[in-house]
A protein has these predicted regions:
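Rossmann-fold NAD(P)-binding glycine/threonine-rich loop
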Residues: 1-2
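C-terminal substrate-binding/catalytic lobe of Rossmann-fold NAD(P)-dependent oxidoreductases
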Residues: 7-124
Length: 124
């Protein structure tokens, strides 16, 4: 919804995880980027900005990964407009939040017919 309401704003996604995480960007960062692309179909994902020169293009969605220490997981979606910035952030301070989500998903799935389900189905 933010991508739709703030359609003239630049979007950058930043995710941070511990130094043992092997994938980059994280699945959650990719999910956020794909949600933006559903609204802004012309979006072009830019993974980092190293070596890029020139002005930022309107359709760019920057995706950045940070790895260090024992960061469990942090995700930020930055909407940068003229003279204002809106950020949506989520920080997981322990892996318990993921375990709770997995348990909730299992409880949902046990009552469903065989098939493929996603978070939208569960959150309904």
């Amino acid at each position: 919804e933010a991508a739709k309401a703030l359609n003239k704003f630049d979007i950058e996604i930043i995710e941070k995880h511990h130094n043992k995480k092997v994938d980059s960007p994280s699945g959650t960062a990719v999910m956020i980027a794909n949600a933006v692309k559903e609204i802004r179909e012309q979006s072009e994902f830019i993974y980092g900005r190293h070596g890029r020169t020139g002005k930022r293009q309107q359709n760019e969605v920057g995706i950045h990964a940070v790895r260090g220490g024992t960061i469990v997981g942090e995700h930020s979606a930055i909407f940068a407009g003229n003279d204002e910035i809106l950020e949506i952030n989520h920080s997981a301070r322990s892996k318990n939040v993921f375990a709770e989500g997995a348990i909730a998903a299992a409880k949902y799935l046990v009552n469903q017919e065989s098939g493929f389900y996603n978070m939208d189905d569960m959150l309904g």
